Amino acid sequence: AASDVYKRQYPDCSSKVLDQVNLSIQEGTLNVICGRSGCGKSTLLRHLKSVLMPHGTASGEILYKGKRLREIDHRTQSQEIGFVMQNPDNQIVTDKVWHELSFGLESLGYDNATIRLRVAEMASYFGIHQWFYKGVEELSGGQKQLLNLAAIMAMHPSLLILDEPTSQLDPIAASDFLETVKKINRDIGTTVIITEHRLQDIVPYADKAFVMDKGNVFLEGSPREIGAALREQKHGMFLSMPVPMQIYGATDSRDTCPLTVSEGRQWLERYCSCLLYTSPSPRDRSVS
């Protein structure tokens, strides 16, 4: 997926909600889009699926597998581009778990044998078989969002887009859900584009990160490159990065920036050892 200097302006609005957006997503990668609330993250994601695109005037092109997105029919987009929304209840359309898993495939006209096979695969992969016959009203928020994800993956999409999918979930359910997203990318090779406010659970595992501000993508690169750039610019988004990166940024260390807690612990041990080694002894201080 790629966009070529894309702009979007809402009706009766003088300012652009997206401005000079130019980015490229490599197939099979996990990509995180981050930025302050209202910077245009959700709007950008909705432009990656035509039926969700907001009204207004736009210029530029969005390409999917080398083709203009607006020229790709809705059926192909429905099957190949999966989209998980913020609120789990806004996406569920049936009353039973098993029916929700099969609904997308039924709508696309798959035969019963294929539907049964894919539903069984997804129920097993996501651990849904334990509540397969339950009504959706009996599910927790985390289970509902997992069901949405499984129903989308049953259609075997090439691109999975997630718009702050854990915003309605408790911390444990959110962590479990993001682990599943990482597993999908790692095991199946599905390209993932996600916006998420719990950056510590997803940024360290991303292949590429993008930072938005006022409708523009002003930084892109690996998580370490993004962290270093935000630190150098003293940008407010640095305080939303994973805690190990924040601690590293508060020091004068030139070592490799840690991303995970494990890396942070190892870096902190090296940093503290270096401080102890270079600090003057009490006798040296008294002489001075």
Ranges and model annotations:
Residues 135-139:
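Conserved ABC ATPase signature
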